[in-house]
Amino acid sequence: MLYQLLCPLHFLNEACHKFPNKIALGLDAKDGYLSVSGWKENSNQLTLDYLKEVNDYGISRLIYTDINRDGTKQSPNFEETAKVSEASNCPVIISGGVSSIDDIKKAKKLKNIEGIIVGKAIYDGDISLEELAKEIYA
């Protein structure tokens, strides 16, 4: 398995036990499969299967990026994100595709979502920091 060559499960498990609730795990996925090497290579590992393997390690949170949506402002892949957040034993941070404040509102309604990373929509002026702050603290 390609991903395990870069981060063997025993290493992740050991790190989580040595630093309980201090490890955030980034899951970068494309079409339901984990991607590695800066998104240059797709693995044959299904994201949800991998998550099931590591779920009880004591990971503090997941940062889930849908590569197909990152930087596109086409809205996050809420369907796949919901599957990940429901399967996860820890809170999930969404990354990839935020286009408007409506995406933030929708993300807040999902189970087990701790946050959402907003990049290009702020940079391009589609979401103002003031508008974002109002929604976060609403």
Predicted regions and their residues:
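Active-site environment of divalent metal-dependent phosphoester hydrolases
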Residues: D70, S100-D102, D124
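Conserved anion-binding
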Residues: M1-D70
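RNA substrate-recognition surfaces in RNA-acting enzymes
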Residues: K73-Q74, A107
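Catalytic cores of alpha/beta
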Residues: C7-N13, E79-E114
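Charged helix-capping and loop-helix junction motifs
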Residues: K40-D49, Q74-K83, A133
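Conserved, mostly hydrophobic/aromatic
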Residues: L25, L62, V84, A107, ...
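C-terminal helical cap(s) of enzyme catalytic domains, especially alpha/beta-barrels
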Residues: F11-K18, I104, K108-A138
